[in-house]
Amino acid sequence: MESKDKSLPKKQRTVVAKIANVLSYILVSLLLLIILVFLFLQTPPGQNFIRGKVQTYLQNKLHTKVLIGKMDISFPNSITLKNVYIEDQTKDTLISGGQLKVQLNMLKLLTNEVQIKEINLENITAKIKRVNQDTVFNFQFIVNAFMSNQKDSSSVHDSSTLKMNIDNIVLNNARIIYQDVITGDDMNMFITHMDAPIKKFDPDHLYFDIPTFTLTGLKGYYYQNEPLKPKIDSAIAVAILKPENSLKIRNSEILLKDIDIDYKSVPTNITTYLKLNKLTAHPDTLDVKSLKFAFKDIALDSSDIALEMGPTKKVQKTATQLQVKEVLSSFSISAKDIAITKSHFKLDNSSMPVTHYGMDYGHLDIQNLDLTAGNLLYNLDTTMASIKKASFTEKSGFVLNELNTDFLFTNTGTSLKNLYIKTPGTILRRDL
């Protein structure tokens, strides 16, 4: 019995063969074209072509000036943007300079997953501001531009939930400028290095697990000016009186090195200068919802802390402020172990007169402070700790060789149990 192929006329077989050949040529050509396009996009001219398209798209989308100096795509692992500049709607700088490198699995994007291994920012300046009472932050137009697309698409079809995960965030030589006229905040900070590996990233529920947080070379200032009262009261009430909106953070270790910042609060008339050589802390619980922060241990080494205080005006509190104060009454900080070595503490309270004899407790200058303590608890009406060892020298000439006691300060009184004080000429033991 003859095969079906042999049963076909010769002319018909020739036509089928020609069609098959044409289709094979088309498929091979398409495959080669895809390969050539892919290879082209890996070349500098190809990536410059993409850079131009992305830059034009963002400018048309945001209706503001957007510049991207260079784009480097290493498929399928990373995207790097260099010399980025984005203006806000007032033609002031929003983001500028440096390099943004994102290491991610691009193939996961096809399954609606954003798996980011690391976000690395270098030599970046970000300026965030809200300069008028009835305006929003200067980055809000970006949120609005992209959120509008999500609203339009959701009305057409219900897409699957986007899964997002970030494993690590690194900052190198970054400056953050923050100004908010409503809250009165004015901040300008430079970060030499920050490393924040993330074990759990859940922005929908505001839950973040950051096992180790490292910050090196933080320098700058944070000023708190007089806020716009009605606005700030409302903002605080939303943040504090609605605990379901609270941030949830889990952390095992905090490492701070080479910190030099100035803090000034106009409402409280307090100025603080912090120069921390090294601070290490191991949190046990960071409960933002209940305002309770517990640490296993805190260690401060070779640091300078200066505190300036002045008289404050008594202001009649609003009902909202009183309600917030009641919630804040649960605020507490505790630590099982505290260690301070080779540090300097200075206090200058201008509301207290200067004393020219003995130790002036309103104008202290303590050098070579070494302190070991345990069971520290601080809240709005109680301070307590067990001082195991303490020594320092003070500008008045007073020298403390050794101190240990269990102290308790409350709104109703003070107690010092198992008090032991040793100076060059005195030894004191008693309970107060």
Region spans (language model):
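N-terminal type II signal-anchor transmembrane helix
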Residues: 2-63, 123-125
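Sec-dependent signal peptide cleavage junction
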Residues: 6-13, 52, 140, 145-160, ...
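Flexible beta-edge/linker motif
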Residues: 43, 67-136, 148, 154-226, ...
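Solvent-exposed loop/turn segments connecting transmembrane beta-strands
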Residues: 47, 92, 395-399, 423-427
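Short Pro/Gly-enriched beta-strand edge/turn motifs at strand-loop
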Residues: 52, 385-389
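Flexible, surface-exposed loop regions and adjacent strand-edge segments
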Residues: 134-140, 227-234, 312-319, 358
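Short, flexible domain-boundary/linker segments around small modular repeats
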Residues: 235-241, 321-322
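Feature captures outer-membrane beta-barrel proteins of Gram-negative bacteria and organelles
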Residues: 406-407
